[in-house]
Structures are given as structure tokens and as C-alpha cells.
């Protein structure tokens, strides 16, 4: 497949192709402009893949610009986290990192230009009065009594704002557009407000800060952005984007294009709701593996490649829709099935004793690291007469559909011997504590010599060599597809979104590193936890199961 055939197509790429063909642009320059007031989530990953992916495919540039115009909510911690997430996803920004605060001097100058043109004024209505005067979708707004101040008075008052002469909330700079506009965003929007807060880049130089809609378009123009890509909620804001650029002296006028945001089943993306999950301790932090944050997905074991593939599959449209969680899970499942080495771990262990195996002895069994990739090599796994198997892999009685170990019948131990269940021991409550078996010594990784068929295969871990491991069985955070539609979204949290088990793993897992996934054979995909795992305590997170159990449950 050629590069052109492999490249995804969508309405934005069609616009870019037309712009390049017509000569409107000779190159492509995009940007990813997050506000550093929180952690990125899977929805941001879509925007990252779109903006950086377009720049890559068209041999253009993509800037990373922090929209840092509200010092009260922003922090350098979020700046560092966002940079890390972008790089982890496999992208690199063009040149230095940009900050909207880099342009505060120019933005101030453009605000003064609008005042001089009679297109901006200092308003002393309170924030509550501004909201009241703005009107509604069905009723026009009304002019502020301060709207018709002279240019000279507005210049003096704006300078008073800049030098700290007003208290917060006592004055702001507004654009003079049309209070009767059918678009509320055009009803004299606020351009500057007062905030006496130290900024993580500019310190205490400024006490007035520009609003997003004023900053965004000018920053795009100053950076030479050719295609400014936003989600659909900014569609009406495009009118203000164009109005600002049309009314200041700036040589470049980028165009804004909107695409649908990512909505994903069984989770929430609202920053307010995610923050509530964290602050009320329904999860263990922003990087909790149940969270839709990039840091949470990474800790759970998602790969950057799987997230990029997911963003590619869902595409870019103008239609709002909700993506099935199964689609995201399918991407990581396919990635790890192809690339994750195999290992054996027993999550719900019960002891199995092979009574005719030489007592006190052990041997090494060779196992492939991947059944379909010999180039991934093999490993030596110890085998002995006492092993752990999963409790679900044994029944005293079962029908023919049960292909595991049954009393009086045989099963194969993965890459080892055929065994037969002979008897069990139970505790006072009737729970099986030990399964006693015999083995066929002539069946190591081969069929029985007499031709009898043994269909079932189960995994195991040698008891004498087993590593105690904690296994965190993560699942979907919510029990319904659209938790945001619930009257109280916290009431539909899945009570089994985290189940912690104490099990055993094969010795090779001692070399596991955070972020490197394994397929625990017959169980699912797991990775070492980056927070709780230590040299003395191995903790593994379930990334995803071998199959979609939610689809079966919903049938």
C-alpha cells in the first residue's frame, strides 16, 4: 500500500488538499493549544493525532502552544504532564514550545488598537450585570451604560486596569459589536479581565489577562497557522475569531475549522466530573487506570500505538456521535495480541499435587514467548510436583462442554504433562484446598503414546518457584454506557471496576518493567503497575481481557 493510499481521508484533509492545489497555501501549519489546567484525556488524544498527524503527512509543522491566559487555574505541573503525553503518543512539536503568554505585549497592543478604532470599551458593570444584559437565545441583549465612552476615556481606563487601579470584577474590556446579534458570543464579548494572580510564565508583570477568544485567533495569526482546528462547541466562536482578525492590523488571517469531539461509552470526559471523581476519592488520582486520561490509560497498559490506531479508526467528522468502548478495547487487544510476550499467572490459585512426580525434584520446561513469533524467542519455566492452578479450572463434576480438569479425567498442563485428577481435600466449609493428581511421564509436550485424546489445556505455576503477585482486575468505571445522562453520574459507578486478587506468577515476571505488557495466558493482558509495584511486591494491572465480556453480558 502506498503512502497516499494508507493516508486517512476526511473533510479537513479535503480542505487542505484544495488549499494546496489552489495555491492558497504552500505549506500546512497546525497547532495543538491545550490550557494547562488539568490532565489530557482520550478526547485530547484525538486532537493531538489530528493536528500532529496532518502536519506529518503534509510535511508541515505543528506547534504545541499552551493557552495560559488564566493564572488562577493553571500550573507548571500540567504543562509538564501535557508535554510528556504528547511525546509519549509519538509526536514532536515544531520549534520551541509556545505559550499564549509569549504574546501578552502584542495582545495588549491589539486591544489598544481596537479601542482607538472605537471597537472596544471599558465596562464597569458587574459580572452578574453583564450576564443579565447579555440577553438569551430568544431575547436580545441591551447596551451597557458604559458602552459609549470616548476613545480617550477608554484608553485611560484600560491603562488603569493594567496598572492595578481597579479591583477584580470591577472593570473589564469588551468588544463593541452588536448586543442584538442572534449569536450570543457576538454580544460585546469580554476581551480582558482583571486577575491579581501570579502567572507561571510572566510572574506578576500583568494583572489583566486576555480571554480565550481574543487570544486564540491572534496567537494563530502570529504563528502563521494555516488551519486552526477546533471541536464543534467552538463553531459559533468562529464569528468572533474572524471579527477580531478582520479589525486589527495583522497580515495573516487563519481559518478555523470545527470537527466533532470524542464521546466514549462507559466514561465521562467533563473536566468537572473527572475532578469530582478524584477529589471525592472514587478513583485514586488522575492516573487511576480506570480514568480516561492519557496518564491513566498509560498506567493501565495501553500503548501509544493502540491509541493512535483508535483515533485513526474513529475518523474525523462534523457529526456528534458516541464511540463504543469496545472499539478502544479492540485496538489495545489487537496490539498486545500481536506484540505482548506470553507468561503464566494464576489469579485465583488452588494447590495441585502430582503424587507420582519425583518428590522434591523439578525440571525446566521450554515455552515460546509468542506462539506465532519465533523471533521473540523462548524461556525456561520451572515445573515441579506441586503447582498452582486456577480454581475455575477444576470441577468435581462437569458436562462435556467443560474442557478443563474434572475428577477422574485428564487435562494437559500448558507445555508440560498430561495429568489426571484423583481426589481432593476440603476445609471445614467444603472449599477445595488441594487437588491430588497423577501424571503421564511420557507426555512432556507431546500426545500420549497410546493415542488417547486429551482436549483441555490449562495453565499453571510451580509452587516452589512461584512469585507472589497482586493482580488488579480493572474494568469499566461505569456500569451504564452513558453515565453523563444519569441524574447522578456517581450513582452508576461500577462497583466491580476494581477487584484486587492475590495470585502467583512464573519466575520470569520478576524482570517485568512498568509499561511493558504481557499476555497472562488464558487470562488477559496485564502490565506492571507504575505506582504500587516494588522490587519486593509485584503488582500487575489488567489492561484488557482476552475477549469483550461486556458484549456477551449485553446479549
Curated annotation (Swiss-Prot):
Main location: cytoplasm
EC category: ligase
Region listing for Interaction with tRNA, in residue ranges: 317-324
Chain span(s) of sequence motif 'KMSKS' region: 268-272
PROSITE patterns associated with the record: AA_TRNA_LIGASE_I (PS00178)
GO molecular function: ATP binding; glutamine-tRNA ligase activity
Domain of life of the source: Bacteria
Sites where the protein binds L-glutamine: 67, 212
Family: Belongs to the class-I aminoacyl-tRNA synthetase family.
Subunit (UniProt): Monomer.
Name this protein carries in UniProt: Glutamine--tRNA ligase
Gene this chain is encoded by: glnS
Amino acid at each position: 500500500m502506498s503512502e497516499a493510499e494508507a493516508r486517512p481521508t476526511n473533510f479537513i484533509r479535503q480542505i487542505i488538499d484544495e488549499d494546496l492545489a489552489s495555491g492558497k497555501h504552500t505549506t500546512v501549519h497546525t497547532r495543538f493549544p491545550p490550557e494547562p489546567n488539568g490532565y489530557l484525556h482520550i478526547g485530547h488524544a484525538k486532537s493531538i493525532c489530528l493536528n500532529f498527524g496532518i502536519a506529518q503527512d503534509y510535511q508541515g509543522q505543528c506547534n504545541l502552544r499552551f493557552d495560559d491566559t488564566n493564572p488562577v487555574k493553571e500550573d507548571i505541573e500540567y504543562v509538564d504532564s501535557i508535554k510528556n503525553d504528547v511525546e509519549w503518543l509519538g509526536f514532536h512539536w515544531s520549534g520551541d514550545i509556545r505559550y499564549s503568554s509569549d504574546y501578552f505585549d502584542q495582545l495588549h497592543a491589539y486591544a489598544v488598537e481596537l479601542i482607538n478604532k472605537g471597537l472596544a470599551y471599558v465596562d464597569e458593570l458587574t459580572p452578574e450585570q453583564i450576564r443579565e444584559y447579555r440577553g438569551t437565545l430568544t431575547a436580545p441583549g441591551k447596551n451597557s451604560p458604559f458602552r459609549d465612552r470616548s476613545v480617550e476615556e477608554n484608553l485611560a481606563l484600560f491603562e488603569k486596569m493594567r496598572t492595578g487601579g481597579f479591583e477584580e470584577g470591577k472593570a473589564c474590556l469588551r468588544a463593541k459589536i452588536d448586543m442584538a446579534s442572534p449569536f450570543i458570543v457576538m454580544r460585546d464579548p469580554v476581551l480582558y479581565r482583571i486577575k491579581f494572580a501570579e502567572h507561571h510564565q510572566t510572574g506578576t508583570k500583568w494583572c489583566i489577562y486576555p480571554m480565550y477568544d481574543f487570544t486564540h485567533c491572534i496567537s494563530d495569526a502570529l504563528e502563521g497557522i494555516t488551519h486552526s482546528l477546533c471541536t464543534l462547541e467552538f463553531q459559533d466562536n468562529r464569528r468572533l475569531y474572524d471579527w477580531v482578525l478582520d479589525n486589527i492590523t495583522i497580515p495573516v488571517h487563519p481559518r478555523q475549522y470545527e470537527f466533532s469531539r470524542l464521546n466514549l461509552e462507559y466514561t465521562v470526559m467533563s473536566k468537572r466530573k473527572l475532578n469530582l471523581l478524584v477529589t471525592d476519592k472514587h478513583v485514586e488520582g488522575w492516573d487511576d487506570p480506570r480514568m480516561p486520561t492519557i496518564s491513566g490509560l498509560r498506567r493501565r497498559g495501553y500503548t501509544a500505538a493502540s491509541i493512535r490506531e483508535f483515533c485513526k479508526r474513529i475518523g474525523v467528522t462534523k457529526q456528534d456521535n458516541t464511540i463504543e468502548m469496545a472499539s478502544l478495547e479492540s485496538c489495545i487487544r489487537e496490539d498486545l495480541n500481536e506484540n505482548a510476550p506470553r507468561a503464566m499467572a494464576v489469579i485465583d490459585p488452588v494447590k495441585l499435587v502430582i503424587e507420582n512426580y519425583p518428590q522434591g525434584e523439578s525440571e525446566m520446561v521450554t515455552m515460546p514467548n509468542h506462539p506465532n513469533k519465533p523471533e521473540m524467542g523462548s524461556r525456561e519455566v520451572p515445573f515441579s510436583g506441586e503447582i498452582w492452578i486456577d480454581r475455575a479450572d477444576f470441577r468435581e463434576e462437569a458436562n462435556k462442554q467443560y474442557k478443563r480438569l474434572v475428577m477422574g479425567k485428564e487435562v494437559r498442563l500448558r507445555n508440560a504433562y498430561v495429568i489426571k485428577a484423583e481426589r481432593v481435600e476440603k476445609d471445614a466449609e467444603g472449599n477445595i484446598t488441594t487437588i491430588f493428581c497423577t501424571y503421564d511421564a511420557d507426555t512432556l509436550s507431546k500426545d500420549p503414546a497410546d493415542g488417547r485424546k486429551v482436549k483441555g489445556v490449562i495453565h499453571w505455576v510451580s509452587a516452589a518457584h512461584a512469585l507472589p503477585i497482586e493482580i488488579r482486575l480493572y474494568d469499566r468505571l461505569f456500569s451504564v454506557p452513558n453515565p453523563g445522562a444519569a441524574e447522578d453520574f456517581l450513582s452508576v459507578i461500577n462497583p466491580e471496576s476494581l477487584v484486587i486478587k492475590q495470585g502467583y506468577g512464573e519466575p520470569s515476571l520478576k524482570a517485568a518493567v512498568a509499561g511493558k505488557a504481557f499476555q497472562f495466558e488464558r487470562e488477559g493482558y496485564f502490565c506492571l503497575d507504575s505506582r504500587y509495584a516494588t522490587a519486593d511486591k509485584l503488582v500487575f494491572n489488567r489492561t484488557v481481557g482476552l475477549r469483550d465480556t461486556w458484549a456477551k453480558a449485553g446479549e
